[in-house]
């Protein structure tokens, strides 16, 4: 199979006769497929969400910066993992629930960034190598479009 993902258009034009012998497509169809695929690769964005414990914030920020992430936002929260939560029964009054969170929840951070899709795998690999003994959760959410209103 021929992959045209990172092939410059000039090289693609030279490859068209070889591709045509394999597929029954016309040159303009090959160019259209190639151009469309390239645009999808360039424009695909992912909302990357990383849940970590506070003490790992500096390490995670360094990993993201090293891997090409140029900006992110951070949300501080208190969290309880499902294994810690198992077996708890919470009274439904707000004071009991808040008391439980204060007593058992851990300080944690959610780091979010919109990144190009090709940055995600290297980031995940770095987490696997450098934070193997730490708790973290990574969520990748594909972005269909971004609308910015800045009057």
UniProtKB/Swiss-Prot annotation:
InterPro entries: N-reg_PII-like_a/b, Unchr_N-regulatory-PII-rel. It comes from the Archaea. It holds the Pfam family Nit_Regul_Hom. To M.jannaschii MJ1244 and MJ1245. This is Uncharacterized protein MTH_1110.
């Amino acid at each position: 199979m021929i992959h045209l993902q990172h092939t410059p258009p000039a090289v693609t034009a030279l490859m068209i006769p070889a591709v045509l012998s394999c597929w029954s497509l016309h040159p303009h169809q090959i160019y259209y497929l190639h151009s469309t695929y390239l645009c999808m690769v360039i424009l695909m964005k992912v909302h990357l969400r990383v849940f970590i414990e506070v003490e790992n914030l500096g390490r995670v920020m360094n990993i993201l910066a090293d891997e090409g992430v140029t900006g992110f936002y951070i949300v501080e929260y208190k969290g309880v993992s499902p294994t810690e939560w198992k077996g708890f029964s919470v009274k439904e009054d707000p004071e009991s629930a808040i008391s439980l969170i204060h007593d058992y929840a851990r300080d944690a951070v959610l780091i979010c960034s919109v990144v190009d899709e090709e940055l995600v795998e290297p980031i995940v690999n770095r987490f696997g190598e450098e934070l193997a003994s730490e708790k973290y959760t990574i969520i990748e959410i594909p972005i269909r479009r971004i609308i910015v209103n800045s009057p």
